[in-house]
Design a protein with these regions (language model features):
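Surface-exposed, interaction-prone regions used to assemble/regulate multi-protein complexes
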Residues: 1-159
Length: 159
């Protein structure tokens, strides 16, 4: 099967309606109070590949990404995971309103997860694709394939 090429290497809040986070694996989170950012390291599924006639299971085009939420604050975590893993069911973007200074619009971003919920207020996000997607039978990369946990802001280049 030919390699999957993402439509772009840096996605933004403007692309939200064309994106989907179902079954993404969340590996790590980081709050950067100096930049007013909240970063998430996750495995993003770009495409579900239907099984061929002689196959039973789906395959998945997956790449590690860094999500950077801008002007982020009021982060709330309500997670209970027996294995410490977090699987995203969906990402919701809700309640648009002006920022306190009235210069920007902020929203609630809410990760609905199998293990609970993560929410925050932010003015937008970037999602940076760090590597070319790999075709796998599992819905996430392992630590070796994804080269560990990372909040790298550099997009992949076509390999």
């Amino acid at each position: 099967m030919a390699a999957h090429q993402p439509a772009k290497w840096i996605w933004t809040d403007n692309d939200f309606d064309a994106m989907g986070w179902h079954d993404a694996t969340l590996w790590a989170m980081l709050a950067d109070p100096e930049r007013f950012e909240f970063l998430v390291d996750l495995d993003y599924i770009f495409e579900w590949v239907k099984p061929a006639p002689e196959e039973t299971y789906y395959k998945f085009w997956i790449a590690p990404v860094t999500m950077i939420f801008e002007n982020a604050h009021t982060v709330k975590l309500d997670i209970e995971s027996s294995q410490g893993t977090i699987e995203v069911a969906d990402l919701h973007r809700e309640n648009p309103r002006p920022t306190p200074n009235g210069k920007l619009e902020e929203r609630t971003y809410r990760f609905e997860c199998q293990e609970g919920e993560i929410s925050l207020l932010a003015t937008g996000f970037q999602m940076i694709v760090r590597r070319n997607p790999a075709l796998l039978s599992a819905q996430s990369l392992n630590l070796e394939l994804r080269e560990g946990v990372s909040f790298d802001r550099r997009p992949a280049t076509q390999e």
